Amino acid sequence: MVKIPCIYENGQIEDIEASESVFGRVYNEALVHQVVKSYLANARAGTRAQKGRSDVTGSTRKQWRQKGTGRARTGAATNPLWRGGGKIFPNKPTENFKQKLNRKMYRAGMCTIFSELLRNNKLVAIDEFQIEMPKTKVCLQKLKNYQLENVMIITSEIDSNLYLASRNLPNLKVVEVDLIDPVSLLAYDNVVITRDTVNKIENVLQ
């Protein structure tokens, strides 16, 4: 078992026990790289598109006769060599960016990230994170009480007060356990989990 420091709003700190298979793994840089790369690739919409000569709007009439003008021969105004013409070999939304990653590897990668965050003192637990009213200043004051900046908070449930109070803060992200992702875990300076989510994270990743 490993121990995660749990901070109370009054400043008191105690250690809570957590599974070593989730929060005590050896760091595997190659696995984390593969998990992050796969997540970013699968998030791509794949909708970029460029217009070829058959897609652009323009006349398909031959611009001048083939011979006798002294100018280079030409055809339609949609010719890629002309200004306003189509693009040679245009990108089409037929590319498949999906990168398959086994569930076992993904979970192992997430466990590795949590373990490394804990080793670097970037992962802490708090007793709870409840907001009494949907006010941003109330949420900001609560963060100051815990001395937290640029933080991602993982909670078991986001009520309407917490959602409304936190959505306008640029350096705060509040997510439920089922919606955590590797990129967000690595993007913030601190990751905070509520006390009741420790077991839920273990159940999801084991």
Curated annotation (Swiss-Prot):
Q: Looking at the UniProt record for this protein, which Gene Ontology cellular component terms does it annotate, in alphabetical order? A: ribonucleoprotein complex; ribosome
> What SUPFAM superfamilies would the database entry show?
Ribosomal protein L4 (SSF52166)
rRNA-binding found in the keyword field? yes
Superkingdom of this protein's organism: Bacteria
UniProt entry tagged with the keyword Ligase? no
How it assembles, according to the record, is: Part of the 50S ribosomal subunit.
Please report which protein family the annotation says this sequence is part of.
Answer: Belongs to the universal ribosomal protein uL4 family.
- Indicate what this protein is called per its UniProt record: Large ribosomal subunit protein uL4
